[in-house]
Amino acid sequence: MIQQETRLKVADNSGAREVLTIKVLGGSGRKTANIGDVIVCTVKQATPGGVVKKGEVVKAVIVRSKSGARRKDGSYIRFDENAAVIIRDDKSPRGTRIFGPVARELRDAQFMKIVSLAPEVL
C-alpha cells in the first residue's frame, strides 16, 4: 500500500529518479493507493537534462507495489519495489520508455500506452 510520504522509484525516462507521495487521488478521505491508482508526487531526485526537474509536483500512476494486489482468480501479484510512472492529465506517460515489468491491472485502469511501452506485463 502506498500512502502519504511514501518514496517510490520512477520506472520511466522522464528524468525523475525518485518521487515522494503528497496525496492519493480518488475520494475525500482516501489514505492508501495500490497498483493502477493515481497519486500526486514531488520529485526528490532527478537526472540532469531531464524533462522533469527536482521539486516539481507531478501526477504518477503506481505500476509496481511491494504489498501486491489481489486478482479476481484469487492469486496475488507482488513486486520487490514500489515504482511509479509519471503521467500527464490525459493519462499518457511523460517519458518515452518504461523500465521493468508492470502489472496487468494497468490495462483495466485504461493506461494502455504504459502497457504497450512496457517490456513485460505480469
From Swiss-Prot:
Keywords annotated in UniProt: Ribonucleoprotein, Ribosomal protein, RNA-binding, rRNA-binding
Keyword Nucleotide-binding found: no
Source superkingdom: Bacteria
GO cellular component: cytosolic large ribosomal subunit
CDD domains membership: Ribosomal_uL14
GO BP terms, alphabetized: translation
GO MF annotations in UniProt: large ribosomal subunit rRNA binding; structural constituent of ribosome
Role summary: Binds to 23S rRNA. Forms part of two intersubunit bridges in the 70S ribosome.
Family label: Belongs to the universal ribosomal protein uL14 family.
Database matches in HAMAP family: Ribosomal_uL14 (MF_01367)
Subunit and interaction comment: Part of the 50S ribosomal subunit. Forms a cluster with proteins L3 and L19. In the 70S ribosome, L14 and L19 interact and together make contacts with the 16S rRNA in bridges B5 and B8.
Name listed for the protein in its UniProt record: Large ribosomal subunit protein uL14
Organism: Oceanobacillus iheyensis (strain DSM 14371 / CIP 107618 / JCM 11309 / KCTC 3954 / HTE831)
